[in-house]
């Protein structure tokens, strides 16, 4: 139903998700499917007449069955080796369709990838970054408000020529620029967010040999005050070295439901406080506030 395969990206999503995000995937249909598919095997196991055996005997039986299956698999592959090897070389994504090997392969690939480690060494970028024209002492420091998160598909966006006006309020403005030639690095937050804030293209990012600092690190080094407010499942390490906060559920806020999920507009209630942070006496050269929204998030 979800149209997914268990690849390294999906394993990464599973590791980095939270309860609120995972609960979006739970439905009556999913529960009924699990029950219907598992009822017969469970009943068979419960009714089976299991004979007690020694640990050595059980181990010997397991080894014998595994060896037999391995030999049989090798013989099958040997008989069709040439077309099989050619197919696997030309269609590498097929390895993620083989259950349950795809789960083991993807999990091992993520676990052994040094770039996945949270303590991996970062290569510095933009060490010469600076503000060319700092604000005068008599003028207010500039503020950049950057909204990041799930959005509609570009082809279904009213500003981009979609036949239905899906952006009625934005369409009334004359100061809106829609970048129609912008492409996401992926369809999951764990893939697209780090790539979006990197200095590399999509191709170079996914083939990189080391981890680098991101745009927020460069802005902070240049003297700007950077703050990340998250209303989703985290910043995926992007905001690890700048001030950040997970948006808290507000029980009395009509924009928050009983499950603890708040609409993105709830973040605007405290936006004025974020703009005043840090105090002006800190020599602030400007502020960058990132709002990571839930957006049109879903399974």
Predicted segments, located by residue:
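Active-site-proximal alpha/beta segments of enzymes that process anionic O-linked groups
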Residues: 78-143, 151-299
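Histidine-centered phosphotransfer motif of kinases
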Residues: 147
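Transmembrane and membrane-interface helices of multi-pass
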Residues: 1-98
């Amino acid at each position: 139903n979800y149209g997914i395969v268990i690849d390294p990206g999906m394993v990464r999503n599973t590791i980095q998700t939270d309860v609120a995000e995972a609960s979006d995937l739970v439905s009556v249909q999913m529960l009924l499917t699990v029950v219907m598919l598992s009822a017969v095997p469970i009943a068979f196991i419960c009714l089976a007449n299991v004979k007690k055996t020694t640990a050595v005997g059980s181990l010997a039986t397991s080894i014998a069955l595994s060896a037999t299956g391995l030999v049989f698999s090798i013989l099958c592959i040997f008989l069709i080796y040439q077309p099989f090897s050619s197919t696997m070389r030309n269609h590498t994504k097929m390895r993620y369709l083989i259950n349950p090997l795809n789960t083991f392969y993807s999990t091992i690939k993520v676990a052994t990838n040094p770039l996945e480690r949270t303590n991996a060494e970062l290569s510095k970028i933009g060490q010469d970054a600076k503000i060319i024209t700092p604000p005068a002492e008599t003028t207010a420091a500039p503020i950049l408000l950057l909204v990041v998160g799930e959005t509609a598909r570009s082809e279904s966006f009213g500003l981009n020529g979609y036949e239905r006006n899906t952006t009625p309020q934005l369409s009334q403005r004359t100061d809106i620029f829609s970048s129609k030639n912008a492409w996401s690095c992926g369809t999951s937050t764990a893939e697209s967010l780090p790539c979006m804030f990197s200095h590399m293209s999509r191709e170079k990012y996914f083939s990189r040999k080391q981890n680098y600092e991101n745009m927020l690190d460069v802005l902070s080094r240049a003297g700007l005050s950077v703050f990340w407010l998250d209303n989703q499942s985290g910043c995926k390490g992007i905001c690890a070295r700048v001030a950040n906060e997970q948006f808290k559920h507000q029980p009395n806020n009509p924009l928050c439901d009983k499950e603890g999920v708040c609409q993105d507009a709830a973040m605007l209630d405290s936006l004025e406080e974020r703009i005043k942070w840090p105090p002006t006496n800190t020599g602030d050269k400007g502020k960058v506030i990132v709002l990571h929204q839930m957006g049109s998030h879903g399974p």
